Amino acid sequence: MKRTYQPSKIKRVRTHGFRARMKTRGGRAVLSARRAKGRRKLSV
């Protein structure tokens, strides 16, 4: 059986990156929540 996590930098950035988060309203909500919480890293 193949493992579920097959690392790829491109896929990681395209789905979880900053610009991907900024594209949608929900993604911007995620970023603002992480800013409010004081996260050092907002996105991948």
Swiss-Prot record:
Comp. bias (Basic residues): 34-44
UniProt keyword Ribonucleoprotein present: yes
Gene Ontology CC: one annotated term: ribosome
Cysteine-cysteine disulfides: none
Record Pfam families: Ribosomal_L34 (PF00468)
GO molecular function, one term: structural constituent of ribosome
InterPro entries to which the protein is assigned, alphabetical: Ribosomal_bL34, Ribosomal_bL34_CS
Family according to the record: Belongs to the bacterial ribosomal protein bL34 family.
Name assigned to this protein: Large ribosomal subunit protein bL34
Organism: Methylococcus capsulatus (strain ATCC 33009 / NCIMB 11132 / Bath)
Organism phylogeny: Bacteria, Pseudomonadati, Pseudomonadota, Gammaproteobacteria, Methylococcales
Gene it is expressed from: rpmH
